[in-house]
């Protein structure tokens, strides 16, 4: 289990649990699931959906596809962003998405 000290003041423990193909509405993509704890007693899932169309749009501009490792890294950066921005994440079960609105910014954080 890994730890992340968030800007909200909470220290989260988390680990990668599962990756699977998924759909959100009319969009297809990949869902990354992390198991997270705030108190080291209760563990809850946090899901990050990486939109396939956003990845394709990026690929068209960059001339190459995102690797599986890069996509995983983007999902993890979105998880950290949620930790930093959302207080009480355990109760809110946010809909975390990587799409055209945030993919480039997340990749920039990774120097990609």
Question: What kind of feature is each model-predicted range?
Answer:
Residues 16-17, 48, 79:
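Generic preference for hydrophobic/aromatic residues in regular secondary structure cores
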Residues 1-41:
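Short, charged/polar N-terminal "headpieces" of proteins
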Residues 33-63:
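Amphipathic alpha-helical interaction modules
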Residues 54-112:
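Acidic, low-complexity intrinsically disordered segments
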């Amino acid at each position: 289990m890994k730890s992340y000290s968030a800007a909200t003041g909470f220290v989260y423990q988390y680990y990668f649990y599962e990756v699977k193909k998924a759909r959100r509405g009319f969009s297809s993509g990949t869902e990354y699931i992390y198991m997270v704890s705030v108190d080291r007693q209760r563990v809850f899932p946090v899901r990050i959906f990486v939109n396939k169309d956003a990845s394709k749009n990026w690929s068209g501009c960059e001339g190459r596809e995102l690797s599986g490792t890069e996509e995983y890294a983007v999902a993890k950066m979105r998880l950290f962003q949620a930790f930093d921005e959302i207080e009480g994440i355990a109760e809110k079960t946010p809909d975390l998405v990587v799409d055209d609105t945030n993919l480039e910014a997340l990749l920039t954080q990774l120097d990609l």
